[in-house]
Amino acid sequence: MPVKAASGAPSRGRLLLALFPATLTALLALAACRSDHRTPVVLYSPHGRDLLSLLEHTYEKAHPNIDVRWLDMGSQEVYDRVRSEKANPQADVWFGGPDTIFFRGAREDLLEACRPTWAAAIPPEAREPRGLYYGAYRTPAVIVYNSGAIPPAEAPKDWDDLLDPRWKGKIIIRYPLASGTMRAIFGLILSRSIEKTGSTAEGFAWLRRLDAQTRSYEMNASVLVQRIARREGLVTVWDLPDVLLETKHSRELGWVLPSSGTPVIDDAIGLVKGAKHPAEARAFIEWVGSVEAQRLAADRAYRLPARTDIPAGDLPAWARDVEQRLVPAKLDWERLEREGSAWMATWDREVRGKGNR
């Protein structure tokens, strides 16, 4: 069987930046020439247009001297770009992605210490001891299905249900090499294999069975859930905020919190080392973690706050419901950080497109 091709074209902006490494610098310089003398704060983020636009407009309204600019890409792509630009950083704020990726960034000296006033409200396990990054949101992974084609009672309820023969050819998966969310989900499967047998072999066998069920691997995260809504596939796995945002546009989306537990990603934020606008970047980070901005993100962009000092009664109904039903999976995040890249290389070499062999 030929290897499955990752479907979906990157956006025009992403394609230009991928093809021409100097494009970002040129675009920022051009924008500066046309600016109204505001100070730019450049964000690299996987958080998507809805949240980024919301924060951009809200922050700029309160700080008219600031021009918030952002580049939306996968969390692994953010890391790769910040790393490649280390000698001449173009971003000011690294905003979003699992803290396992931020750990790598800290180890490679890509981040600079920043100590916002809300740091103590973040659990110790979700903040770097030296102040290099902090959790901003808690992001659970969910099973997503087309509720127009699948009655809720018949939808997959847990990870193993994805291997049921009735879903063969009906699953679309986000291309995991570019996605921190998918690395966490695949990492959960492999970690459980190690815990049970002492080896990843059973976990990779599970992933091969999932590959046999998979219709395609989607490169573009922004259209993954849309494809399920359009019935190009019927089932996927992805992060809850993106799914809830898409339900504003489609009534044919349902989601399930896996009954055995799901990865809950500490979506972090940090100051890029060598940022061109460090003071403005620190001020933006301070605002993102403020009670005001955390509530705004929960109300308008379906983000669970990382802060532990916000009363449940101050959160929207959807967040209270998720917190009550959520079963966080026990996942060895340190092992995932150490071995995740090797696991993904093995998946790409030995699993992708080989499930039916």
What positions do the PLM features span?
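Short, well-ordered beta-strand elements
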Residues: 38-48, 66-71, 170-171
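Extracytoplasmic ligand-binding site segments that recognize negatively charged/polar headgroups
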Residues: 46-47, 51-53, 76, 90-232
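Short alpha-helix C-terminal cap/hinge motif
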Residues: 54-69
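A ligand-binding cleft/hinge motif common to bilobed small-molecule-binding domains
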Residues: 100-104, 229-230, 234-252, 301
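Periplasmic-binding protein-like
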Residues: 121-124, 139, 205-210, 217-218, ...
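A bilobed periplasmic-binding-protein/Venus flytrap-type ligand-binding module shared by bacterial periplasmic
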Residues: 142-149, 190-192, 266-278, 296-297
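Mature extracytoplasmic/periplasmic domains
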Residues: 272-330
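Conserved C-terminal helix/tail region of periplasmic/extracytoplasmic solute-binding proteins
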Residues: 329-357
